Amino acid sequence: ENTTPFNPRDAFGSHSDSDHVYNTPRAWYMQRFLNPYDEVWDGPDADHKPTSDDIPWARQPERKVTIEDIKYVLSSHYQGTPFDPYGQLGDERTRHMYRTIGINRQSQLAVMQIRPYRPQASRAIQWMAYGSNPFNTLVPFFPNVDTTPAYLEDTTTRVTSENFYWANRIIAALCDGAFRSTSNAVERYQEKTGAMGHRLVAATDE
């Protein structure tokens, strides 16, 4: 009896019209970023396009993935393509054609880092960001702790820059409508806090 290989995408996925706006383009961009040299991603002769129904179900990235890579992918808005709503490529039609991964309705992002080379008590780190991913920043938390600094530990009922959640919400509200003039400042904020997070983790490990 002839059989065909099991295809999990066909078995568990869908190919609806809404997928071609909300889901498939995001899978295309993630794989385009993590596997840029595996295939041709752009142009009329691209192996896969944003609406292709045969984008691989899973694939191994071309290099080891960092915390920053995960943050970039989950904050992405089709940078470097005509589909970026903040970009200058394409036109008004293409810039609003597909739903981005990073959107203003996001509330929080968590990235789990398991470090097998560390003792059990400090092996895991949970990197957390609050608010809209294109404008927020990741900070590291050790899960095996009893208390967290007040600035980080909750979401207050009062909007204030003295709370990490609301500080990132405020940044997004101020920068979303002025992306081109504020993106460099947001990127510096993300890089500085990320570097400080890695430095604090390294100091704690010592």
What does each of the following model-derived ranges do?
Residues 1-206:
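C-terminus-biased signal that marks the final domain/tail of proteins
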